Structure formats: structure tokens, C-alpha cells
Amino acid sequence: KRLQAAAETDMLTGVYNRAGMYQQLAEIEEHLKDRSEGLDIGLMFIDLDNFKHYNDTYGHDIGDLILKEMAAIFRDVSIGKGIVSRFGGDEFIMILETNDRKELEEIAKEIYARIEATSGFKKQIEKHLGHEIEVDESRLITCSMGISYAANVRNEDSVSELIKQADDLLYTVKTGEKGHYKFI
């Protein structure tokens, strides 16, 4: 049991890794076989903005700190609503049990508010480094999101389609003005 948990958990952030996310989806799909209705699902594909700058400038310890702080925010805003996974690198996916656009938008705004309240984790970074840093406003840690949603989702293929839609939206955001979200 502990080995399975270790194989499904991102050891740095404590959230599911990609394999863990797909395992959770397989378990949900198995559970849905006996139900007449599927689940309403919202999916947020999240990419950290300016992460590479901090990781390259201040080192991997600071990159790790940022990943942990972001994962904690995602975990906090999704408690009781869904799962969070580190999809790879500085990308995260939140799968939430709602297809209500307004609720999904409130969750996105809560994420941005929490990041903004930390000034892009400036104090945490300075504490870790042991000295102050100058951060240009355009270099603050933020995130960009692609958000997709659907009703009556019954299988992993449907979730894979939501991931693709959200990833495409995320790409659109990242090629424009970062630090925003876009809905399907």
C-alpha cells in the first residue's frame, strides 16, 4: 500500500503525480460503471509563469520551494472538491467535481488572490536565501490556466478530451498575456 502511494505521489509537492492522477481517474471510472449518471467535471490545466527564471537564477531549491507553495494553494482550494496532480515540470492539473463555470471561475480567482497575497512568494524566497531580492513586477510568479468542463463524464477518454481542451486553452493564454485563465 505504501509503495503504491509512493508511486502515485509527487514526492516534492505531496500531490498526485501523473500516474496517480490517472489511477484516481480509473478508480472513478470503475465506480461510475454501476451508476446511471456520470460526473460533472471541471478541469484546470495550470502552468506556472516565470518559474524558469527563479529556478535558473536562484537554483533548484527555490524552484522546489515555489512548486511546493503552489501545490499547497491548489490543494487548499480543491479540498473536498477534487484532486490535484503535478502533471510534469511546472504544470499542474486540478480535476474538480463541478461543471459550474461560475464556481470554477471563483476557484481560479481564489488561486490568483492567494498568489498575489504572497507577492509571488517573495518573502518565502528571501527567507530561504537569507537576503532580500529585487523582483521586477513582470517577473513575479503567477500562473496561467486553461479551464474546460463537461457534464455526465463517464470515462477516462472523456477526461482525456477535457485535458486536451484545457491544454489548448492554456497554450492560447501562454502565447498571449500570461497570468490569466481562459474557458472552453
Which residue stretches match the model-derived regions?
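Conserved nucleotide-binding and Mg2+-coordinating catalytic segments in signaling enzymes
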Residues: 3-23, 46-60, 68
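Short regulatory alpha-helical coupling segments
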Residues: 4-5, 18-39, 71-79, 97
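Short, conserved catalytic or interaction motifs in soluble domains
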Residues: 56, 97, 175
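Alpha-helical scaffold within the catalytic cores of cyclic-nucleotide enzymes
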Residues: 71-72, 103-134, 167
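A short pre-motif secondary-structure segment
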Residues: 83-86
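Catalytic strand-loop-helix junctions within cyclic-nucleotide turnover domains
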Residues: 95-104, 124-138, 142-162
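Catalytic/regulatory signature loops of cyclic-dinucleotide turnover enzymes
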Residues: 152, 161-184
